[in-house]
Amino acid sequence: MASIGIGCGSYFYASRYAEYGLSAVAILGPGTVAFFGSVKIARVLHHRITQGRWTQKENSAWWKNDTNSIRWNSLIPLMVTLVTSYSFTICMTYAWGFASQAGLNQGIISSVMNLLAIFDCIVFYFAFGEKVGWIHIVGVLLMIASIVCIGFAVNASEEDDEVDEDADEEDDEIDTGGRSKALNGILAIAIGLGAPVSLTIQHYFIRKHSGVYTGQAQAFDVAPLLNIVFCFFMPQLMDQLDVTWEDIFVGGAAGSMMESGRVLISYSIAVGLAGPVTAIVNANIAYQTILGVLLASQSLDTFQVSGILLGFLGVCAISLFDNVVKKVKLTRRLSSLRS
């Protein structure tokens, strides 16, 4: 569900506003803040009506019921999640920009996010003793192969279209920003690596503090704060785009879907295996591709079809096959005990 939410939200956001760079995040802000603000108000009112109180202090991440004091430690995961969300957005935006100036396929940068599953597996193994089975490893590898296939295929086709349109134009040369292509390529990869590192740090703190401050609560509290800051980019965006109410609605819907997906990710990270979870979520690019086919009449090439099929097999390996193996092992144990 998290992968579907992020994939659908990313499609509607990227297809309309990605060309405006970092300032495009402003279009996500107003609607997303309104959505999560409304949900928070509705939850408070529901609790007031059903329990007769505005808050539930005994289960609050922000209140110590035994000492009747504020739980200041909850600020740590909140601020870490907020800062790492900003750093992820900034790293990906500038990495794509440098990749374009280096003449690189931007799918390389998108594929760097595959390292997140590997980073999570390593960090969670040493920090929490979390181990993954061979089926999970196979599933993660299939998901990585899926994203690589789709990422390279989509971006390669976009670059081919641009080359065909501009082949006869004199200004077809790449704007390197005054730097060499080699330097731009190094900057693209180096900054792009900051994105999975940022989310690995975020996932570590989500799990570490999940006993008191649940993963979904952290993400739910961060979502409006993150998008309030995005709103400050609106003047910069309005210099490039005549923003309409339709844009606000589409941006809000896209932002709400992506943030809802992140809430589900945070919950899954807190209670499940971090590496396989992030591998499945990274398959959101497959949903973007499918929406492009259904809504924009885009065609699928061999790489994209292969990527979607590999992604499906990866999900099955991580979730379905794992349950089957567990049931088989349980059946064998019961049989041995009976005998």
In which residue ranges do the predicted regions lie?
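C-terminal transmembrane-helix exit sites in multi-pass transporters
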Residues: I41, L116-V138, A286-S306
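Helix-helix packing/entry segments at the starts of transmembrane helices
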Residues: A26-L28, A102-I118, H209-L225, E259-L294
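Hydrophobic/small/kink-forming positions within alpha-helical transmembrane segments
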Residues: G5, G9, L82, Y86, ...
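Juxtamembrane C-cap of transmembrane helices in multi-pass membrane transport proteins
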Residues: G7-G21, S87-L104, V112, F126, ...
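Loop-to-transmembrane-helix transition segments
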Residues: M1-S3, T50-M92, I186-A195, Q240-S260, ...
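Hydrophobic alpha-helical transmembrane segments of multi-pass integral membrane proteins
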Residues: S3, E19-R48, I76-V80, L142, ...
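Hydrophobic transmembrane alpha-helices of multi-pass small-molecule transport proteins
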Residues: I135-N155, E165, E169-G177, F303-D322
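Glycine-/small-residue-enriched transmembrane alpha-helix faces in small-molecule transporters
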Residues: M1-A26, G37-V39, E159-V212, L330-S339
